[in-house]
Amino acid sequence: MSRKKSLVEMADLHGUACKLPQGDLEDLLKGVELPEEGGRVEVGVGDDAAVIRVDGGYVIQSVDFFTPIHPDPYTQGRIAANNSINDVFAMGATEVLSVLVVSGFPRELPEEDAREMLQGFADQCREVDALIVGGHTIMNPWPILGGCVTGFAERYVTVGGAEPGDVLYLTKPLGTQPAMAALRLPEDVRKQFLTDSELEEAVDLAVEVMTEPLKDAAEAALEVGVHAMTDVTGFGLKGHAGEMAEASGVRVVIERLPVIPGTTELSRALGYGLERGESAETAGGLLVAVPEEHAEDLEDAFERRDVWYRRIGRVEEGSGVEVRGDVEEVEDYP
């Protein structure tokens, strides 16, 4: 009798690493004539979510789905929901109005596993008072799960407002991709890098990262009045910092790379580029640019909400991204 495949064995790419690479996406869109933006659209293609002006504020809309990164169906459902919803928080939404579920399941996936994925998704939505109002489900060779999320904001923050002199904060450690990849390695290979207890710690921390909503972090940023913010996901810290640099017309310098313990050596062996800020993240932290004179206010706002953070860099005149920081294996998350 054949062994039942786990969720992660049903896909070749996992979590936000299944996203089309950043450069490939940019090349693809160059050949597409999109309808002109206008009317009520304040922010369109190129940010974490679209922003549409309505009476009394702004509707924030995003869609996000991906393949499994965790073998447990319920946990995977929670991660998928959190990753979908975080995009609207990263634009300043203070309320999630609705979620439409996007799902695809292989024929060989047991119905109970699919149901557990959906239950995890629903429970994570409940944690941030997000109502599921519908969805669409297809048969698909790889399992996929995510959602189209609609939020509301009285004001919004884009990725493109960073200014020279700003300092940068990150609200979660990096390293989800190598941490979860360790689960898929043959035991004899994995033990070259991590003991059983180290693996358990790394995976547990990665799950904490991937299921922690950005709601409190975003509320703190809005309270202080930050210049720019974005969530760190499939393009990695360097890629999303690059989006901030390009959209803002500035240079971003990364001086510190806080990571989940044990993931740096794994990343070097597997070629993920975590030590260069290039490793894909799934449902990662909020990257925030704030004027240096308001940095202490932001730290205070984070601490009052029990939001973990690190000051990781600064914004200069110029262009592009420079990663010159040392890796820090964090011991205080969450």
Curated annotation (Swiss-Prot):
Cofactors named for this entry: Mg(2+)
Site feature location: Important for catalytic activity: 19
GO cellular component: cytoplasm
Keyword Magnesium: yes
Binding site residues for Mg(2+): 48, 87, 231
GO terms for biological process, alphabetical: selenocysteine biosynthetic process
Keyword Chloroplast: no
Cofactor binding note from Swiss-Prot or TrEMBL: Binds 1 Mg(2+) ion per monomer.
Protein keywords: ATP-binding, Kinase, Magnesium, Metal-binding, Nucleotide-binding, Selenium, Selenocysteine, Transferase
Enzyme Commission numbers on file: 2.7.9.3
Catalyzed chemical reaction(s): hydrogenselenide + ATP + H2O = selenophosphate + AMP + phosphate + 2 H(+)
InterPro entries, A to Z: PurM-like_C_dom (IPR010918), PurM-like_C_sf (IPR036676), PurM-like_N (IPR016188), PurM-like_N_sf (IPR036921), SelD_I (IPR023061), SPS/SelD (IPR004536)
Single annotated GO MF: ATP binding
Source domain of life: Archaea
First-level EC class: transferase
Active-site positions on this chain: 16
Assigned protein family: Belongs to the selenophosphate synthase 1 family. Class I subfamily.
Entries under HAMAP family matching the protein: SelD
This protein's name: Selenide, water dikinase
Lineage: Archaea, Methanobacteriati, Methanobacteriota, Methanomada group, Methanopyri
